[in-house]
Design a protein with these regions (language model features):
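Alpha-helical transmembrane segments of multipass membrane proteins
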Residues: 12-16, 40, 44, 68, ...
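Functionally important transmembrane alpha-helices
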Residues: 27-87
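Membrane-interface interhelical connector segments
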Residues: 17-27
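Small-residue packing motifs within transmembrane alpha-helices
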Residues: 2, 6, 33, 37, ...
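C-terminal membrane module of polytopic membrane proteins
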Residues: 62-119
Length: 119
């Protein structure tokens, strides 16, 4: 379910990918966004399931969206616009995101709970 959530979330970002983030490498950006959204979806779901507090993933999402402008000191959309993503960047993004976030899928909160039948 978490993977499907990440895919849907990535699809929801397609207009931003094509209009705001890049106008030269749209298809690559869509694939990169899918990798990012699936990875962050796993982590955000873990954070929610661990805390049972919707504000935790909301705050994490806010930090994710705003850390680059804060760290760069460029408080403008320019820091996020006109990105270039090449096909060779995608395997690197997949491996790095997989290493950073994939192991959360092994957490107890994602394990299927057995339902005991009443006799």
């Amino acid at each position: 379910g978490v993977i499907i959530l990440g895919i849907v979330w990535g699809l929801w970002h397609i207009p931003d990918d094509l209009v705001c983030y890049t106008q030269t490498s749209g298809i690559q950006m869509i694939f990169a966004q899918q990798i990012t959204c699936i990875s962050l979806g796993i982590f955000f779901a873990y954070a929610y399931m661990k805390t049972q507090n919707i504000w935790v993933p909301v705050c994490l999402h806010y930090l994710n969206n705003n850390l680059i402008p804060i760290i760069s000191g460029t408080f403008s959309a320019d820091v996020l616009e006109n990105q270039t993503v090449s096909w060779k960047d995608l395997p690197v993004a997949l491996v790095l995101n997989g290493l950073c976030f994939g192991f959360f899928l092994l957490a107890d909160v994602f394990k299927k709970k057995e339902v005991q039948e009443e006799e």
